[in-house]
Amino acid sequence: MIFKKILRYLTVATLAIATVFLISSHKTVAEDKSKLLNSKAVQKIVKRGTLNVGVKQDVPNFGYYSAKTNTYEGMEVDLAKKIADELKVKVNYIPVTTQTREPLMDNGTIDLLIGTYTINDERKASYAISNPYYYDQIGFLVLKDSGINKISDLNGKTIGVSQGASTKAALQEYASAHNLKFNYVQLGSFPELAVSLYAHRVNAFSVDKSILSGYESKKTKTLKEGFKTQEYGIASSKSNQDLIDYTNDLL
């Protein structure tokens, strides 16, 4: 009997402590979110009434501009809209490329960059970057009749990469580790790289596999083999760290 009373007392006490802990935790989270919402970086956008977001316009499924509908579409476009909705402001999509996205953050043209931006230590040293919202790996798009079926088949061949992207550095690191040699052609956009592949100016077009999927056709294939995990993050200038912290709460 005494044991049952003690057990009942301990159960009630445990539940009471757990309830207090949960209430305290929810209160802390709410206070943190309120603090971020009222931060200078976030309130600047709220008062303006518009969130300026840099997005890609040539990456199907992520950031793509449709001339037919005159709209932007893709998961990154949707993510930008979600953040704007949370802030109760309009969203203004600003097209970026791998070459222009960082300068547009530097000069304040865009508040956030949501454009297949790979997280790495060098970028984290220069920009405020969110937690990852997407994971991928680097891949290769080749012509089906090229005879190229694995990465080692590209030894001594020419690979097309995007200017300003981290792909070339990753390929150089991979080649060095696997005793391979690649030649490189750097172009300004993904459509240009796809055209170069069809024109046989490059033997492969290399970037993250999810991006390559938007350029696959009856004549091309993405190699099953890939390498180096890529993490995409939302980025902004260092002065907008509170804005990035706010987006982390939404991811």
Question: At which residue positions do the language-model features occur?
Answer:
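Sec-dependent N-terminal signal peptides of Gram-positive bacterial secreted proteins and lipoproteins
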Residues: 2-28
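A ligand-binding cleft/hinge motif common to bilobed small-molecule-binding domains
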Residues: 100-103, 117-125, 170-175, 191, ...
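Ligand-binding cleft/hinge of the Venus flytrap
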Residues: 65-69, 80-89, 167-186, 217
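Periplasmic-binding protein-like
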Residues: 135-142, 209-251
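A structural signal for short loop-to-beta-strand junctions that line the ligand-binding cleft
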Residues: 42, 74-76, 124-133, 221-225, ...
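Acidic, polar ligand-binding/catalytic clefts
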Residues: 81, 85, 90-153, 220
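Extracytoplasmic small-molecule ligand-binding "clamshell" domains
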Residues: 31-115
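Extended ligand-binding regions for polar small-molecule ligands
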Residues: 31-36, 77-86, 148, 152, ...
